[in-house]
């Protein structure tokens, strides 16, 4: 037995590392990234701005300027606290670290895989409630789970990833008001939705929101934020590692996130293309296509694995979810540019000989 195998926690040896597929020379439609790169003009301005980054110095420990930039971009009320993370994953882990060893984390399935992974990393007990066949939360089942497991944390993606739907608001409110747990609503796709719980933080002291800039064009920055009451943020900030937002992310985000008109214009294009792509998929009769309020679409397809491989062979990478709970024969495609979406549709139509 090697040194690392004798040294490592036994439960860590039993899990697999998060897998990111090779995507070189492919149209990437698998990771819910924005398809839009910076314009040449904006790139030139950005590079000029970046010159002032003092790489020999540690970054601002509290990221105050970036905090204000994000508040303006997302219209976050001044009375709420904001905590920044190196991606939302760091903030999910920070919340888990605030729990006692053995506490229970509750979520729904299928949902964002990192809730369960981070729970296991931090030696907490992970429990989940299966969604209905229509990917909704059954209120009675969730309430029963809350009473049975007495969770310390409840994670709910709103809208849900990978299904793309918004859960019933009244059910979410019932969950928040009926538990002593901290309820974390992950609004990663807030820009593409018709609803948000942002202002509800004033009503529910146990409500925390997560957001990210990854889905609005800046996945490479690895920047997430936690929004909650100021008291909650003050306490959670004790667990934040020092200098967790590096200088390049701070300087880049402070410049790029002020381009609100460009960000909103790109979001509008994606919303329009989401409808175009949805309509095109619905016309392929063998597919079952699920409505989405995110920047991706989930669909169920015959010969799932063969279609997935056929798309890769033709230069398009999407996400194969067919082995996940409740997602048998399901694939997920990220909304791309008009050209990328058309290429994807053409390949799917060719596969089914339409």
From Swiss-Prot:
Pfam families, per the entry: Aminotran_1_2 (PF00155)
Pathway named in the protein's UniProt entry: Amino-acid biosynthesis; L-histidine biosynthesis; L-histidine from 5-phospho-alpha-D-ribose 1-diphosphate: step 7/9
GO biological process: L-histidine biosynthetic process
Modified residues annotated as N6-(pyridoxal phosphate)lysine in this record: 215
Listed EC numbers: 2.6.1.9
Family recorded in the similarity comment: Belongs to the class-II pyridoxal-phosphate-dependent aminotransferase family. Histidinol-phosphate aminotransferase subfamily.
Protein name, per record: Histidinol-phosphate aminotransferase
């Amino acid at each position: 037995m090697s040194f690392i195998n004798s040294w490592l926690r036994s439960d860590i040896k039993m899990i697999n590392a998060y897998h990111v597929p090779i995507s070189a020379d492919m149209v990437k439609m698998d990771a819910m990234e924005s398809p839009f790169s910076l314009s040449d003009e904006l790139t030139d301005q950005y590079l000029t701005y970046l010159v002032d980054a003092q790489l020999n110095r540690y970054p601002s420990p509290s990221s105050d300027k970036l905090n204000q930039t994000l508040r303006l971009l997302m219209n976050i009320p001044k009375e709420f606290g904001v905590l920044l993370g190196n991606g939302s994953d760091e903030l999910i882990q920070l919340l888990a670290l605030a729990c006692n060893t053995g506490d229970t984390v509750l979520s729904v399935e299928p949902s964002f895989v990192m809730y369960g992974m981070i729970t296991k990393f931090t030696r907490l007990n992970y429990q989940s409630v299966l969604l209905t066949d229509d990917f909704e939360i059954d209120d009675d089942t969730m309430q029963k789970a809350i009473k049975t497991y007495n969770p310390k944390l409840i994670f709910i993606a709103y809208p849900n990833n990978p299904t793309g739907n918004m859960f019933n608001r009244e059910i979410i409110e019932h969950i928040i008001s009926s538990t002593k747990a901290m309820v974390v609503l992950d609004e990663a796709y807030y820009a593409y939705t018709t609803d948000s719980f942002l202002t509800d933080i004033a009503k529910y002291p146990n409500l925390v929101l997560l957001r990210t800039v990854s889905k609005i064009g800046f996945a490479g920055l690895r920047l997430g934020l936690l929004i909650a009451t100021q008291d909650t943020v003050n306490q959670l900030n004790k667990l934040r590692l020092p200098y967790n937002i590096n200088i390049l992310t701070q300087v880049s985000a402070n410049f790029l996130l002020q381009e609100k008109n460009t960000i909103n214009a790109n979001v509008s294009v994606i919303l329009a293309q989401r409808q175009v792509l949805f309509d095109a998929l619905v016309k392929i009769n063998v597919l079952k296509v699920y409505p989405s309020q995110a920047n991706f679409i989930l669909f169920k397809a015959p010969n799932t694995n063969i279609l997935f491989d056929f798309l890769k062979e033709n230069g398009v990478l999407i996400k194969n979810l067919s082995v996940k709970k409740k997602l048998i024969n399901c694939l997920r495609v990220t909304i791309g540019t008009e050209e990328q979406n058309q290429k994807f549709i053409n390949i799917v139509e060719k596969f089914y000989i339409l």
